[in-house]
Amino acid sequence: MNCKIDYQPAPNLLANRVVLVTGAGDGIGRAAALSYAKHGATVILLGRTIAKLERVYDEIEAAGGPQPAIFPLNFEGATLKDFHDMAETLDKEFGRLDGLLHNAGLLGRITPFDQYNPELWQQVMQVNINGPIWMTQALLPLLQQSEDASVIFTSSSVGRKGRAYWGAYSVSKFATEGFVDVLADELANQSNIRVNSLNPGATRTQMRRSAFPGEDPFTLRTPEDIMPTYLWLMGPDSSGTSGEKLDAQPPRV
């Protein structure tokens, strides 16, 4: 396991870096956006609920971080044109992208496969893998403008070992792991872009509550607790690390 939960980031770790976080309105995305801004990054907050993004925006400003930006987008309905329009807007505003955290995700249902709704399956695949893939393609020219770019795809333990009833979510995370291998290998030795997958582990989030409704959330780490690995992967201390499968926290005993 490759875990950096004890990492001690420099206060200015991400100074002068432009970082986009998807699903930035709450949970791990919110914690990552706040943490990246605290360490100097200009954060682009992407999500589907403007009110949530505005709250995170206000939190960053109140903490004295660099002025963030808000970009509303719903992966479920996003088209290739939406991604390319977004890239064009970011190019005009920032001229480059130094980091991309694919955090937005959809659980779907934990249910036997023979009862899985095909429309829900397609929604999960769109949000968890298809959308992030085509967004990454649209943003590659901006990432190539950075001297040291990091792309992080959110994985899961069920994307590394399949579990009964996890259906589309598990399959989408296996696809994520495969795409990280492909893209990292493709960009090796010809790009300043590193690409890795990161499994947050058991964390106190709404998705976790939906998946494990009987679990005591206070036995879990908070999103803030697992930020060291997110910071390490996004910052220059992980330079040269690409195509790796990392964990944000040690496995639960």
Predicted regions and their residues:
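Active-site loop of short-chain dehydrogenase/reductase
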Residues: R17, G65-P66, R96-D98, L143-S156, ...
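Substrate-binding pocket helix/loop in short-chain dehydrogenase/reductase
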Residues: M86, T111-F113, N117-Q123
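C-terminal helical subdomain
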Residues: C3, N189, I193-L198, T205, ...
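Conserved glycine-rich Rossmann-like NAD(P)H-binding loop of the short-chain dehydrogenase/reductase
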Residues: A41-R55
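Conserved glycine-rich cofactor-binding loop
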Residues: V18, G23-G27
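Catalytic loop of short-chain dehydrogenase/reductase
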Residues: I133, Q144, D148-N189, A202
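Rossmann-fold cofactor-recognition segment
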Residues: A63-T79
